[in-house]
Regions:
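Conserved loop->alpha-helix
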Residues: 1-94
């Protein structure tokens, strides 16, 4: 686990769910990139959208039904692991 963040909102869409999380306002923000991988509570997912204050993931029904995501509620704190390649790339710059 690298960090924790707050679930801001869950939107039920036609055939998926959109989970919107609070974005980081420090050096961790550099790892939150559109289409990058991110693990939330141990589940490897893809970041769908990023804004200054939040980032979101889209979840298909199979993932929703077979993971702990269906038990997460708005304002809950979740565990975050950043993409390994993003961390490696950042380290190699230094």
């Amino acid at each position: 686990m690298d960090r924790t963040t707050e679930l801001l909102k869950v939107n039920k869409l036609n055939n998926s769910w959109e989970f919107c999380f609070k974005n980081f306002q420090d050096e961790s923000k550099k790892y939150i990139v559109d289409k990058a991988s991110i693990a939330i509570n141990g589940i490897s997912l893809t970041i769908a959208n990023v804004s200054a204050d939040s980032f979101s993931i889209s979840v298909i029904p199979h993932t929703y039904e077979n993971t702990n995501l269906k038990f997460i509620n708005e304002n809950d704190i979740v565990n975050i692991e950043f993409d390994y390649l993003a961390r490696f790339s950042e380290r190699s710059k230094n």
